[in-house]
Each structure stands twice: as structure tokens, then as C-alpha cells.
Amino acid sequence: MRDSKKYVVKIPNFYLVKTVTGVEEWAVATHFEPVQARYALPCFDEPAIRAKFNFKVTVPNELTSLCCMEVTDKSVDGANTTYSYATTPSMSTYLLAVCCGKYDFVEGSTKSGIKVRIYANRGEGMGFNFCEPPTLGSRD
């Protein structure tokens, strides 16, 4: 896709997340398999047909945007932050992943230097100590 049109995503993937403290907050996440990618972008929803994708996501400053690729640029313009992501490898549309919400993260590296981040809903990072050691060790 080589245009810069803005698409309004009209797919049923807006979730009301209840935090551990009982607060309800909205989070947005894609769930394109098996054939829902066509509701978000013009494409052939066929696993054998692949393409490379570039994502740029703008969210209010209090939210974090995550994508299936690494952030290449992050810019703040007033009340909004725009995240730009690296180009994906050639892939099927159902593998695309983007989510936005209030998240915290911890970051570490494997012994071989691969950067790993673990995300949780903001304020719910108590599980980080449980999942970080096995996650970082799983790639070495």
C-alpha cells in the first residue's frame, strides 16, 4: 500500500479492560486472523499473498502504541504522540499487530544481546519479576 490516507478502523477490536484495581479503561488491539484485516486496510486476506507494511500511529500522550515492529521514531506534537515503526518483513495481513493503551514495561537483553520488552497494563507490573527471567533466558 503506497498511499498516505488515514483509515478509520471499524473492526470490533476495542476492548474495555478492567485493571487489577477495578478501574475500567479502553484499549485498542488488532485481531486480524482469519480474515479481518480487510476491515482496516485494503488487502487480499490470503495467507499466500504477502506484502511489506509501514505503520505510523498517533495517540494521545497518555497512551502507548505497540506494533509488531520496532519504533524508529517517536515525536510529540502538543497533546499527541506519533510512533513510526520499522518496515515489516514480507508477511501475510493476518500477522499485522497494533495496539494502543496505558502500558508499563520493563526492558532487558538476552545473553546474545537481543532486546526484549515485557508490557503490562499501567500499574500492574507486579508480574514483571515473575516473567522477566524466563523470558530473557528463552532466546539463549
Positions of predicted regions on the chain:
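Acidic/His-enriched low-complexity segments
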Residues: M1-D140
